[in-house]
């Protein structure tokens, strides 16, 4: 039996008595970085193949600069334990990224390739108990999770590629995303967990389903009853300001074009504290009901996520949605179904346009093509880029 297939507690014992440990390359094939469009403070993320399961995964490993020379656990080290515990508690939600494995590696290179590894897989308790031991040894924590397509990252999709470009989600999709996100917060708050780190970089959306990543900065409040109500209100505030405002307007809450938000512990705490008024002047077509609801959240006039959900459902009925407590007209309901079908076809059409453009680009780099054919291919690429720059759905 290979050491990489042994239980983590046996491998840990092997480590303690000085026997051979499994190598990183026995468990994972590490590929390229996949976080370059939105770098984080705590960790780097690489594509990897789990050689035990055959799954393609995202391999998230703590940045080497967060190792302490004295073997102490800095906040960034503890954050991996915090994330592991919260992911385990929320694992039944369809809206969080799936996790597969937690563990530690000895390689201190930013992009690890070699060295030893201890894998706890889904044994979160064992991983948490081992944190201090492997911090003292100078090993870095890692976790693996499902590798979500970059094409589903809202920040990647909505980030402008020219000074005058800006995209927003259609209101139908924005409402669907907001309902799923607030449902996730409702589940988390029921477990005394606040997410806090709301930004587009952490939001993945395929037009139907929401996935949220990065729970490093999330917090459990079980020993802080006095502050809990304020923290729940702040979580709703951060969702309205940091995610929903941007996806409905295509703008940063700092009243600039979209840009990466700072991600250190201190930055997460302070990121939106001074934002209590949202500017919707650049998106006059946005429903007044949506704008008013988000403004109430920004002003912290919504104290619980359930209050936000109730308000969101009332607003959504004006867009053809139907709920047990809030009704819409039959005509609006039918029109919404037609709009949903149209948006689905629109997404498919835009994807076909991208595929056509990429085929033309590949043809352009062929050696020996005629000048006339080259000119026509360039013309088509330019026209399709213009179509995509003016697309309806990010």
PLM feature spans:
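Conserved structural core of kinase catalytic domains
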Residues: 100-168
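Terminal C-lobe "cap" of eukaryotic-type protein kinase domains
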Residues: 298-322
């Amino acid at each position: 039996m290979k050491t990489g297939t042994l239980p983590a507690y046996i491998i840990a014992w092997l480590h303690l008595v000085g026997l051979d440990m499994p190598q990183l390359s026995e468990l994972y094939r590490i590929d390229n970085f996949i976080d370059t469009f939105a770098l984080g403070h705590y960790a780097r993320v690489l594509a990897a193949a789990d050689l035990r399961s055959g799954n393609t995964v995202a391999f998230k490993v703590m940045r080497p600069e967060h190792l302490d020379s004295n073997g102490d656990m800095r906040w960034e080290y503890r954050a991996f334990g915090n994330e592991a515990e919260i992911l385990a508690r929320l694992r039944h939600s369809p809206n969080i990224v799936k996790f597969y494995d937690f563990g530690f590696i000895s390689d201190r290179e930013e992009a690890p390739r070699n060295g030893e590894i201890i894998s706890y897989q889904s044994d979160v308790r064992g991983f948490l108990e081992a944190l201090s031991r492997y911090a003292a040894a100078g090993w870095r924590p890692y976790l693996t999770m499902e590798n979500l397509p970059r094409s589903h990252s809202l920040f990647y999709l909505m980030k402008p590629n020219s000074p005058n470009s800006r995209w927003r989600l259609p209101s139908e999709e924005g409402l669907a995303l907001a309902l799923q996100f607030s449902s996730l917060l409702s589940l988390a708050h029921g477990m005394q967990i606040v997410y806090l780190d709301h930004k587009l970089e952490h939001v993945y959306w395929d037009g139907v389903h929401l996935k949220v990543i990065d729970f490093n900065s999330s917090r459990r409040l079980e020993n802080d009853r006095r502050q809990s109500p304020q923290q729940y209100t702040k979580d709703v505030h951060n969702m309205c300001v940091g995610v929903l405002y941007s996806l409905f307007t295509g703008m940063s809450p700092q009243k600039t074009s979209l840009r990466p938000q700072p991600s250190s512990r201190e930055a997460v705490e302070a990121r939106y504290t001074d934002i209590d008024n949202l500017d919707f002047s650049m998106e006059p077509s946005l429903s007044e009901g949506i704008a008013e609801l988000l403004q109430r959240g920004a002003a912290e006039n919504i104290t619980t996520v359930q209050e936000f959900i109730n308000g969101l459902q009332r607003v959504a009925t004006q867009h053809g949605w139907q709920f047990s407590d809030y009704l819409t007209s039959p005509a609006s309901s039918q029109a919404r179904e037609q709009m949903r079908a149209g948006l689905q076809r629109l997404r498919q059409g835009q994807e076909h346009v991208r595929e056509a453009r990429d085929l033309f680009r590949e043809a352009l780099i062929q050696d020996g093509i005629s000048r006339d054919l080259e000119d026509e291919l360039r013309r088509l690429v330019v026209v399709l880029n213009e179509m995509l720059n003016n697309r309806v759905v990010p």
